[in-house]
Amino acid sequence: ESIPFSETRGYVKNVLAYDAYYRHFMGEKDALMSDAEWQRRY
């Protein structure tokens, strides 16, 4: 079965967002994005 692109995109965004929330609540100080990611033009 195939998953529509928009659903996949939404799922990935949610996973990344909840990963950031979890890290914050657990007291981890990791950066959300690397320096290379901040400098990249999307």
UniProtKB/Swiss-Prot annotation:
InterPro entries: Lysozyme-like_dom_sf
Domain of life: Bacteria
Top EC class, one word: lyase
Reactions catalysed according to its record: Exolytic cleavage of the (1->4)-beta-glycosidic linkage between N-acetylmuramic acid (MurNAc) and N-acetylglucosamine (GlcNAc) residues in peptidoglycan, from either the reducing or the non-reducing ends of the peptidoglycan chains, with concomitant formation of a 1,6-anhydrobond in the MurNAc residue
GO molecular function (one): lyase activity
Keywords: Cell wall biogenesis/degradation, Lyase, Periplasm
Protein location: Periplasm
GO terms, biological process: cell wall organization
EC number annotated for this UniProt entry: 4.2.2.n1
GO cellular component terms attached to this protein's record: periplasmic space
Family designation: Belongs to the transglycosylase Slt family.
Function description: Murein-degrading enzyme. Catalyzes the cleavage of the glycosidic bonds between N-acetylmuramic acid and N-acetylglucosamine residues in peptidoglycan. May play a role in recycling of muropeptides during cell elongation and/or cell division.
Name of the protein in its database record: Soluble lytic murein transglycosylase
Gene that this polypeptide is encoded by: slt
